[in-house]
Amino acid sequence: EELVEEALKKIFSDQQYAIHDPEKTESWIKFTLGMIQKALKTKGRSRSIDEIKQAIEVMNKCNIALYKNKKEIWSGAILQDLVTVGREEYLASTDTHHIARLPLFISHSINNLDYRQFNYDRLMSCDEQLTRWLYKRLINRFTQASHITEYSCMYSDIKQASGLLQQNKEGNNRSKILSAFNELKEKGVILSCKINERKIGRAITDIKYTIKATPQFIKEQIASNKRTTDIRT
């Protein structure tokens, strides 16, 4: 579902398929299954039409919630108010246009011009889902990336926030994070990652990861900051 979601947001960025109402804070996207399939195939992430159908079903029917300070601030589906040609033909044709409303927080970001631009090609080239999750986190959190700044995060936070560390053994979960960070090194995002284990006795209770960015990622973050500033002024 996550890759299909990214493809849809990329399609939305093409104004030909985007409808945004700033007064109502609503954003709608027009798409076909064929458009999604082509967008994924172009980035080496080919999916069958049936897989795309299932992903859209999940994004439309599953409810997610956002919390701030342990208080729910938003609840809804990733694809809301899905409009199709009829239940019999529901997502049956690769050439049939469908329309869906994007979540409120996306519309709010567009209205306030506080969304982050990033390297979409690099995101889609990452093989591991956790790698893509960490990459998007760095894009949004490591906004002041420079040659002298570092970004730190905790294992416990990654596990809770990502929902992608479901192994029974914590050692396997930790290995999965290291694999994701290594892929980010290969993709030219992070230069180094220092590991500081927190222990009680011999037991590891948490891990602190301290990251330095590559010159390329620093350059991209600076450019993204400038574009955001230019748009707002």
Model features per residue range: what roles?
Residues 1-233:
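Charged, alpha-helix-forming regions
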